[in-house]
Amino acid sequence: MTRTVKSISILPAYRLKAAVALAGAALLSFGLSAAARADDLAVWDDQTYEGQSAVIEQLNKEFEAAHPGVMIKRTARTFDDMKLTLKLAVSAGDGPVITKVNQGAGDMGAMVKEGLLLPVDDYIKQYGWDKLQSDSVLARDRWEDGKFGVGKTYGISGLGEIVGLYYNKKILGDAGVALPQTFEELLADLDKLKEKGIAPFMMGSAKQHLALHMIGAIDQAHIDASNRAELDDLIYGRGGSWNTKGNIESAKLVQQWAQGGYFFPGFEGISGDDAVQLFISGQGAFLISGTWYFGDMQHNPDIGFMAIPAPKGISKPMSVGGVDLAWAITSLAKTKPTQDLAGAYIDYMVSEKAAETWANAGYLPATSLAADAKPKLTPLLSSGIEMWKTLNANDALGHYPDWSSPTMLKTIDDNTPLLLSGNITPEAFVDTMDKDYQAYLKDKK
């Protein structure tokens, strides 16, 4: 997954070093740190939006209440901060016992290779997680000898994610534009909006990954689920090439939008998070991003959510997505009691009870709701749940492109501004992605 959210409790680098130094001094002074106790769990998560954080705090309190004597020592970090610090912290012995970790070669794959994560297959059997989530979803947390999608399972996620098309019903209605049913209709709608002086798309490319999601979502909407094998092979490191006509055409279209005035003015200087807030305030007709923004988007009742409309001839279009960062147990869980407590914690985080709590807060749970659950669903979440059911039924849940290599996210982030500004061609953009991927395949051999 490639999303970034605003921080609520992030230590600057100098404070992190100071905290580590103080922790080391405490160990020397007292011989045994609190983090070493089996009943004291250091947990890192990426739930840094206010609504998400409130859910995690509630679930943590409930877990502590059900396990007297257990204390959750929580640290919340943004996606990008997690990528920068997690592997180093666990390697140094200063990290969490339980953590969220991004699937894919750059994070989970690298940590598994270095022995920094523990397999959770025993807990899958013990708690029946394979009854709560499909095997195709759990496969996104499997690694074996550098191979993605096979072997032992190293995590499980609590939230489902879909990248789709947010739209502002009022703006579209005032402009006399109907919701598009096909990709061709979407293109026509964008032209109508632009002619009326309305920014067709909200966009922010200064920080975060809105452009990446836009390119990936458009490309995968043009892939029928019956033809997904090529994409699966790319993501799971089995081979192939990013240098395809479909990827080039998607990059070309997004570049044309950027150069042709289809994006909100000044998008180059706006971060992805700020672009979302502008969209919520009523700026822009459409925005392509993921369900992780449901909690914020629900504050504007005019905002709806739908799949990227498929082009004619595609009956089961794919959607970028899958699940949020996985809950995992690190190698810092040294003892069996600590590992078992970590397993119990993760079980609660992916339970039907937790799923209902997330749903009540407006977020899309990866675990199916219990038959007798009666959450208060927002219109956005209702749309998301129906999309989730359809995508899973059609085997059309796609992938985040950055999962395909350890360095792909950086490669895409470095080159997307160049693509949008017209400083590189769509062909060069895709070629850069493919060179990154081919180098990764070569290094794996």
Language-model features: where?
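Extracytoplasmic/periplasmic substrate-recognition and gating elements
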Residues: 61, 65, 92, 151, ...
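Hinge/lid segment of periplasmic solute-binding proteins
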Residues: 105-163, 213-214, 305-306
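C-terminal capping/gating helix-and-loop segments adjacent to ligand/active sites or protein-protein/ligand interfaces
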Residues: 364-371, 384-438
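Short, solvent-exposed loop/beta-turn-alpha elements that line the ligand-binding surface or hinge
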Residues: 121-135, 221-249, 299, 310-319, ...
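Glycine-centered hinge/linker elements that transmit conformational signals in sensory
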Residues: 190-193, 232-267
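Conserved N-terminal structural module of periplasmic/extracytoplasmic solute-binding proteins
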Residues: 23-25, 36-116, 125-132, 179, ...
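Extracytoplasmic/periplasmic solute-binding protein
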Residues: 145-158, 163, 187-239, 284
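Extracytoplasmic/periplasmic substrate-binding proteins
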Residues: 46, 213, 218-221, 249-341
